Swiss-Prot record:
The lineage of its organism: Eukaryota, Metazoa, Chordata, Craniata, Vertebrata. Transmembrane segments: none annotated. Changing T59 to S/Q/V/I/N/D/E: Loss of phosphatidylinositol transfer activity but no significant effect on phosphatidylcholine transfer activity. The keyword DNA-binding does not apply. It catalyses: a 1,2-diacyl-sn-glycero-3-phosphocholine(in) = a 1,2-diacyl-sn-glycero-3-phosphocholine(out); a 1,2-diacyl-sn-glycero-3-phospho-(1D-myo-inositol)(in) = a 1,2-diacyl-sn-glycero-3-phospho-(1D-myo-inositol)(out). Belongs to the PtdIns transfer protein family. PI transfer class I subfamily. It is found in: Cytoplasm; Nucleus. GO terms for cellular component: cytoplasm; nucleus. A 1,2-diacyl-sn-glycero-3-phospho-(1D-myo-inositol) binds at T59, K61, E86, N90, T97, K195. One of its GO terms (biological process) is axonogenesis. This is Phosphatidylinositol transfer protein alpha isoform. It comes from Rattus norvegicus (Rat).
């Protein structure tokens, strides 16, 4: 049994802008989660092309997770089992990410398939699942300006879209009805990231608990990440994809250093 949910994240940026903003924010967020032997290690970051013509950027990362998994898993899992591999094929505006664990092999999988569309999250079944499968998928809307969707320990005033005003674009702050207002704002673009998340965790007695925990963490990550992305708008809106590739190279070097020298930091599972 696998657990599927679709998270819809609406943003006051264009699909083209988001491509740069997402990559910038991934690099920055990685630094915030890396230290004390834990965090992100980038193994591969290179262009790819498949036989069917699909092409984009392929990345392979290892997440060293010790303090970032629940205590009940930490107690049961042997040393080294708490590292997960993330392989991503970014054929923007479509992206596919597959997360696996060498210890659990085919008993553990997180798959995130994302379509980025220039709409307000109104499309049904953008991933074109079979009607019977789609019927069982729960659609969850994430509102980046809704403080109630953010855990108090994750809240940062400087990363609050309800308070942020972009100097370069004039966008923000986002009020309670910002999504409805977007429709009438001719000068402000918008888009939705449709994130279909498949979770499989086969471990007798823990399956439901862990699958639900993972979905809860994915929603938390998507919420925090996209709040940051919008509030960092002025830092990335003028960047090109060439700028991003140079930044990713520098970030890889920094992450290797931070994992060795910095203390453990970032989100922990038991928060």
């Amino acid at each position: 049994m696998v657990l599927l949910k679709e998270y819809r994240v609406i943003l006051p940026v264009s699909v083209d802008e988001y491509q740069v903003g997402q990559l910038y924010s991934v690099a920055e967020a990685s630094k915030n989660e890396t230290g004390g032997g834990e965090g992100v290690e980038v193994l591969v970051n290179e262009p790819y092309e498949k036989d069917d013509g699909e092409k984009g950027q392929y990345t392979h990362k290892i997440y060293h997770l010790q303090s970032k998994v629940p205590t009940f898993v930490r107690m049961l899992a042997p040393e080294g089992a708490l590292n997960i591999h993330e392989k991503a094929w970014n054929a923007y505006p479509y992206c596919r990410t597959v997360i696996t664990n060498e210890y659990m092999k085919e008993d553990f999988l997180i798959k995130i398939e994302t379509w980025h569309k220039p709409d307000l999250g109104t499309q049904e079944n953008v991933h074109k699942l079979e009607p019977e499968a789609w019927k069982h998928v729960e659609a969850i809307y994430i509102d980046i300006a809704d403080r109630s969707q953010v855990l108090s320990k994750d809240y940062k005033a400087e990363e609050d879209p309800a308070k942020f005003k972009s100097i370069k674009t004039g966008r923000g702050p986002l009020g309670p009805n910002w999504k409805q207002e977007l429709v009438n704002q001719k000068d402000c673009p918008y888009m939705c990231a449709y994130k279909l998340v498949t979770v499989k965790f086969k471990w007798w007695g823990l399956q439901n608990k862990v699958e639900n925990f993972i979905h809860k963490q994915e929603k938390r990550l998507f919420t925090n990440f996209h709040r940051q992305l919008f509030c960092w708008l002025d830092k990335w809106v003028d960047l090109t994809m060439d700028d991003i590739r140079r930044m990713e190279e520098e970030t890889k070097r920094q992450l290797d250093e931070m994992r060795q020298k910095d203390p453990v930091k970032g989100m922990t599972a038991d928060d």
